[in-house]
Amino acid sequence: MALDIVEYLKEREIAESHLRAQNQPFITLSRETGCHSRIVGEMLQQEIFRLTGKKWHIVSKETILDAAKGLQLNLQQVKQVLDAQNKGNIEEIILAFGDGRYRSYQKVRNILKKIISEIAVEGHCIIIGRAGAIITAGLPAGVHIRLTAPLPWRVQSISKQLSITAKEAAAYITKTDEKRLKLFQDFSGKELETAFFDLIINNQRVSDEETVEIIIHFLQQKNRL
């Protein structure tokens, strides 16, 4: 009987530890192409540190590639999955006969979902893009933000960022938005809906500073800081 009690207490401690882990706060930042997700993410990081003394880390495509490299995944294949590219004939041949680091695209997606989920469970991070909102939807401590703006504003933004013409910027936005939508669908099997997000902010009408202020206030109201 005593042994049963000890085992019970151990199991309870493990369960409570798991629950605490799931309650570590984190943010996902989704965006339409041309919106200032990286800028907002870095400003949020600085403001959270100023207010709490805690350094939240930014999770970008590069972060996930580093984690994938540590797991000895084929980085070319990982990049193709993250960029929502379809595998071609060469990849099919490699999958069948070649590089042992190649896995099925579904397996790679599952591994990447696990990487992102585990990062989110650790908490105190800002996940930029990568279908973060849907991948982490089951974690209660997440706050999911989407930045949006009218197309003309985004064209101007991208044109300035990349030093390209408005026509080139419009084509770039169309292509990138399509890739991001496909990535979301690949990871979730669902269409992108506003219901996945806690806050949707118009990046044209709301400045980056105001956006950070709104998100910080929301985090405080939800006891996430």
Language model region names:
Residues 4-18, 84-91, 165-208:
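Small-molecule kinase domains that catalyze NTP-dependent phosphoryl transfer to phosphate-bearing small molecules
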Residues 21-27, 31, 123:
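Pre-Walker A (Motif I) flank of P-loop NTPase domains
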Residues 29-44:
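Glycine-rich phosphate-binding P-loop
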Residues 46-55:
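Post-Walker A helix-loop "phosphate-sensing" segment adjacent to the P-loop in P-loop NTPases
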Residues 62-124:
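ATP-dependent small-molecule kinase phosphotransfer cores
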Residues 113, 208-216:
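Short, amphipathic alpha-helical "lid/cap" segments that border enzyme active or binding sites
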Residues 129-133:
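Short, polar loop motifs at secondary-structure junctions
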Residues 140-160, 165-173:
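Conserved phosphate-donor/acceptor-positioning beta-strand/loop module used by diverse small-molecule
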